[in-house]
């Protein structure tokens, strides 16, 4: 019973954090409603056990001068993209964004510019094969955090997910991505936020 109370408390904290987030645009306002609804009404939202929708956290990683953004070339999407990944049972989504950034880029000296959510979005993921197993189409209920890293720290590639990691100017992030929806609705938004 104590674990259930703890989990409910963690979910309520995240719902409050998302409810307090001021949407940047209409996409974020609608996605905010959907994320809160899923958190309130669906089970296992912090686990991939929920095959319909689950929580993820992304990182918009900038250098200290704020003139470069760190991106990885994701094999599944065949595109340059921000860093991030699944909550996988972790309720601290900032911790997820930090963990995924380190895993995908090798950068260890990284910190949040703010502990508040930087953006949020519901991302549709098309069906794909991962580690030899088919994964059906589903939704990522995503929150993004603004992180800062040292641009000159050595980068490393997470070979099972990425084929490259590199710094780009904010404008180059939009051109580098081959995912039109991401370019128009996410990277465009993040470069001006």
Task: Set out the residue ranges of the language-model regions.
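Charged phosphate-binding loop/patch that engages nucleotide di/tri-phosphates or the phosphate backbone
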Residues: 178-193
């Amino acid at each position: 019973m104590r674990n259930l109370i703890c989990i409910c408390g963690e979910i309520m904290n995240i719902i409050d954090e998302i409810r307090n987030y001021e949407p940047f645009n209409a996409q974020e306002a609608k996605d905010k409603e959907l994320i809160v609804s899923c958190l309130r009404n669906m089970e296992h939202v912090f686990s991939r056990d929920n095959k319909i929708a689950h929580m993820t956290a992304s990182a918009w990683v900038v250098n200290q001068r704020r003139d470069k953004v760190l991106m990885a070339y994701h094999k599944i999407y065949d595109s340059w993209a921000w860093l991030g990944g699944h909550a996988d049972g972790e309720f601290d989504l900032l911790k997820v964004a930090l963990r995924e950034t380190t895993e995908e880029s090798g950068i260890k000296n990284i910190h949040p510019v703010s502990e508040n959510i930087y953006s949020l979005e519901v991302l549709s993921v098309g069906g794909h094969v991962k580690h030899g197993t088919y994964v059906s189409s589903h939704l990522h209920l995503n929150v993004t955090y603004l992180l800062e890293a040292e641009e000159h720290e050595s980068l490393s590639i997470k070979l099972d997910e990425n084929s490259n990691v590199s710094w780009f100017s904010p404008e180059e992030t939009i051109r580098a991505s081959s995912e039109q929806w991401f370019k128009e609705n996410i990277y465009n938004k993040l470069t001006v936020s």
